[in-house]
From Swiss-Prot:
It comes from Kluyveromyces lactis (strain ATCC 8585 / CBS 2359 / DSM 70799 / NBRC 1267 / NRRL Y-1140 / WM37) (Yeast). Transmembrane segments: none annotated. This is Mediator of RNA polymerase II transcription subunit 22. The lineage of its organism: Eukaryota, Fungi, Dikarya, Ascomycota, Saccharomycotina. Pfam families: Med22. Gene3D superfamilies: Mediator of RNA polymerase II transcription subunit 22. Belongs to the Mediator complex subunit 22 family. InterPro entries: Med22, Med22_Saccharomyce. Keywords: Activator, Nucleus, Transcription, Transcription regulation.
Length: 121
């Protein structure tokens, strides 16, 4: 997947999670008799609200879990793409760099040895 596709999917999933959390908050306000409900409810009305509230809570909770799982998959894909983009594309280039580093180390060792040998009485 391209980066743009992953970012679009991330935006959609985040929006879905946000909406689901809003629905759960509204549902909990309805279930517990929000601030603007001044009328006492009958027992049959409470049972209806409770059973439908449980179903809706379950549905929204499942949506949250699915959304979080999607976010984990998306972020993992983004991290993997980022890590893979950090690796050198050409093995010859990395071999050349390692040979150059090795040559620099050899020069440093040689210079150090000469300095040590020259300083000895």
């Amino acid at each position: 997947m391209s980066n743009q596709v992953l970012l679009d999917k991330l935006d959609r999933t985040t929006e879905t999670l946000s909406n689901t959390l809003i629905h759960l908050a509204k549902l909990s306000d309805i279930e517990f008799g929000g601030k603007d409900t001044e009328q006492p409810r009958s027992s049959s009305g409470l049972a209806t609200v409770s059973s439908s509230g449980v179903q809706m809570s379950n549905n929204y909770t499942m949506q949250l879990i699915k959304g979080i799982q999607d976010l984990l998959v998306i972020t993992r894909s983004i991290r993997e793409k980022w890590v893979l983009s950090q690796l050198p594309e050409n093995e010859e280039l990395s071999m050349f760099e390692s040979e150059e580093t090795l040559e620099n180390c050899r020069k440093l060792v040689q210079e150090s040895m000469e300095t040590l040998l020259n300083d000895m009485p």
